[in-house]
């Protein structure tokens, strides 16, 4: 295999290498210099496989950086994104490792920010927060100590109270007595609030 054409792609900030077999791959300036790439250079199968792997890693890493540029992501979200682009497991693992080493990917930090946002901006129950983080691929063990520290029983009680207050006038027109209590109790359970919270709030009506 012989290198027949070398161009620099300004948009991607990388060299585009083409061979006599119509294969092509991208290399950063550092890798281009490291391997002393030049026209008419003969590349054996082993070197080509290595350069192609470097090219694929660079492509996957660039996609991840762009994906992260919009907002914080979880490890699962990055993996799902790269899998959708058909990258190998080896490449994906290497990208995840590099992102973590650069402090660009941290599920614990993501969970803390997510929890704080939901506490300050919503009336989500603790269970709702846990379920949402689970959907994002973050195991409860990663953040459970922090969640327990910042989201206690009284806070959940307050949030449940606020939610019920937005509904109670409508419900009172339809229900009374046991039916009203049951409506409140069931509603709060469906929203992810604990049995104790649901029982205490419904007992107030």
From Swiss-Prot:
The keyword Hydrolase does not apply. Its main location: cytoplasm. InterPro entries: RecX_HTH_1st, RecX_HTH_2nd, RecX_HTH_3rd, Regulatory_RecX, WH-like_DNA-bd_sf. The keyword Oxidoreductase does not apply. Pfam families: RecX_HTH1 (PF21982), RecX_HTH2 (PF02631), RecX_HTH3 (PF21981). One of its GO terms (biological process) is regulation of DNA repair. It is found in: Cytoplasm. Keywords: Cytoplasm. It comes from the Bacteria. Disulfide bonds: none annotated. One of its GO terms (cellular component) is cytoplasm. Modulates RecA activity. Belongs to the RecX family. This is Regulatory protein RecX. The gene is recX.
